[in-house]
UniProtKB/Swiss-Prot annotation:
One of its GO terms (biological process) is peptide biosynthetic process. GO terms for cellular component: cytosol. This is Elongation factor P-like protein. The gene is yeiP. One of its GO terms (molecular function) is translation elongation factor activity. Disulfide bonds: none annotated.
Length: 190
């Protein structure tokens, strides 16, 4: 089993009976002699979606779990269920609207590339989205002529219903790139 200092973002740990996906790691090196380096890890509970934060010493042994990652494409909606199809063997994976409520805010109508499902022991756990997505602004205050890139921000409603802060110079109808995890504007889409 690996030590805490060998854990990387995206790995899955079995900790206190919970499956936790590593979302972020902060390394804190104490200045006192003989003190151990601390690893503050932020997780997402695979089953509940709740955020969890834990601290480990560098030489603490942790239990990792290997999940199966499968590339999927969005297929169709059946009432309250969203069906995704495996890209290789066409296995359907079904999520309820409640299970992927957060992910739906970033998913354009026809789906998006690079989506994956995570499974463990044949059990469907999580729909994982890529880091960024391009979405269209459907509603925002009109763009201000002469507004610079470093100007103030304004709220914008995107095609999926998500509301984020964007620079003042953007207007409705423009496609922008969003960082999914941080829910922030990154720039205009290519």
């Amino acid at each position: 089993m690996p030590r805490a200092n060998e854990i990387k973002k995206g790995m899955v740990l079995n900790y206190n009976g919970k499956l936790l996906i590593v979302k972020d790691i902060d390394i804190q090196s104490p200045t006192a002699r003989g003190a151990a380096t601390l690893y503050k890890m932020r997780f997402s509970d695979v089953r509940t979606g709740l955020k969890v934060e834990e601290r480990f010493k560098g030489d603490d042994i942790v239990d990792t779990v290997t999940l199966s990652r499968r590339g999927v494409d969005f297929s169709y909606v059946d009432g309250n269920e969203y069906v995704f199809m495996d890209k290789e063997d066409y296995t359907p994976y079904t999520f309820t609207k409640d299970q992927i409520e957060e992910e739906l805010l970033f998913m354009p109508e026809g789906g998006m590339p690079d989506m994956q499902v995570l499974t463990w022991d044949g059990q469907l756990l999580v729909l994982e989205l890529p880091q960024t997505v391009d979405l269209e602004i459907v509603e925002t205050a009109p763009g201000i002529k002469g507004a610079s890139a470093s100007a103030r921000n304004k709220p914008a409603t995107l095609s999926t219903g998500l509301v984020i802060q964007v620079p003042e110079y953007l207007s409705a109808g423009e496609k922008i790139r969003i960082h999914i995890e941080e829910r922030r504007y990154m720039g205009r889409a290519d």
